[in-house]
A protein has these predicted regions:
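Residue-level detector of flexible, active-site-proximal loop/helix-junction positions
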Residues: 12-13, 95, 123
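Glyoxalase I/VOC metalloenzyme domain signal
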Residues: 1-7, 22-85, 105-146
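Conserved S-adenosyl-L-methionine
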Residues: 7-9, 91-92
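Short linear motifs in intrinsically disordered
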Residues: 20-23, 92
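Short Pro/Gly-enriched beta-strand edge/turn motifs at strand-loop
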Residues: 11-18, 84-88
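Short acidic/glycine-enriched loop/turn segments that link adjacent beta-strands
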Residues: 96-100
Length: 146
């Protein structure tokens, strides 16, 4: 398939997580890999706080839950989606204050949730590292801890 290597985080920390405006402490395991310019995320929420991940599973679905758009102009994209009528359902930060992300309620319009992800700071460095590791990957060490 040309996907790999996978980078695994046992306890991904999502700071300032909010679901429908209410703060919660979400716990997750995450694996990331690239196939060319496309990053694939495998996310397993390990507690039962409310989130769009829980909403998706509780509705009886599984599989492809969201598509992410990376941006270096997070505030403008956030405002653009709100101006288009999409509501933020959950949001938080990963990798510090420049690692903001938000999931918008877009399932009625496009069939899946839209995530915007700020591509800056340590998160950008990690995403670049994962992409670079995928270029010419020979299949060795398919699972690596981040």
């Amino acid at each position: 398939m040309g996907v790999g290597p996978w980078f695994y985080v046992e306890n991904a920390i999502l700071d300032n997580f909010k679901y429908k405006g209410q703060p919660h402490n979400i716990e997750m395991k995450v694996a990331l890999a690239n196939s060319g310019d496309v990053q694939i995320e495998l996310i397993q929420q390990t507690n039962d706080v409310p989130s769009m991940y829980q909403d998706f599973l509780n509705s009886g679905r599984e599989g492809f839950q969201h598509i992410a758009y990376w941006t270096e102009d997070y505030d403008a994209m956030y405002q653009h989606l709100q101006d288009k009528g999409y509501d933020v359902v959950h949001e938080g930060q990963i990798g510090g204050p420049q690692g903001r992300m938000a999931y918008f309620d877009s399932e009625h319009a496009v069939g899946i949730a839209i995530e915007i992800s700020e591509l800056a700071g340590s998160k950008k460095q990690i995403f670049d590292y994962i992409k670079k590791a995928s270029i010419g990957w020979n299949g060795s060490k398919p699972i690596r801890k981040l």
